[in-house]
Amino acid sequence: RLTVHQTHFFRHVPSLDLVAEQWLPAYLARGEVDAIHAWSVGCSTGEEAFTLAMALDRALDRLTAGKAYFGITATDISAPALAVGRAACYPRAKADEIPVDCQARYCEPDEEDSFRIVDALRRRVGFVQFNLMDIARAPLKRLDLVYCQNVLIYFARERRVALLDALAALLKPGGLVVLGPGEVLGYTPASTVRLGGPQTLAFQRT
């Protein structure tokens, strides 16, 4: 049983840019997509899931004038961490991790020393308890995007490869799995191609 709670908003901007600026425009251009279904794996207290929601919301607003829907399932093994994510309330100091334009659009004061994510964005993220070691029983199928950063690093390489294979198998054709840079080196899952540059690690389903 592995629990990891250290997380931040906008932790790895190059990965977010890969999703919003490179993958998503090309994926939408296929003409077969009217909604993006994403999985934030090992979401801890929700910062990464809400960061991904901000990135998708801004990008879809720009690319589709907000006509394309998106939803994120955020999972973690820790019930206390998930409770924080569901509350969507964070210490005021954490707002400094969020770009100013996103603060204005997606954050609102809660109490003197805290802020919360606005309801419109919070409703796009559902928090569910799930143990990644039970990946064979994952309730999610045919996903557009799997975002799994700084989770696989805690496993031995053989287990990392097996988990990456399982995550990639859940993608629709053209879907993307995003890992933290360096989490799985020298390996590409079957039926995928590497996408992005040296600062990112992502694989697109063919």
Give the location of each predicted region.
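A short glycine-rich, Lys/Arg-flanked "PGG" loop and its adjoining helix->strand segment in the class I
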Residues: 161-173
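Conserved class I S-adenosyl-L-methionine
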Residues: 33-51, 71-73
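Conserved SAM-binding loop of SAM-dependent methyltransferases across substrates and taxa
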Residues: 45-64
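Conserved beta-strand signature within the Rossmann-like core of class I S-adenosyl-L-methionine
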Residues: 173-181
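Conserved AdoMet
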Residues: 1-41
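Extended basic-aromatic, gly/pro-enriched interface segments that bind polyanionic ligands
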Residues: 41, 62-147, 151-161, 185-186
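A structural alpha-helix within SAM-dependent methyltransferase catalytic domains
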Residues: 20, 53-57, 168
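Core SAM-dependent methyltransferase catalytic element
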Residues: 186-206
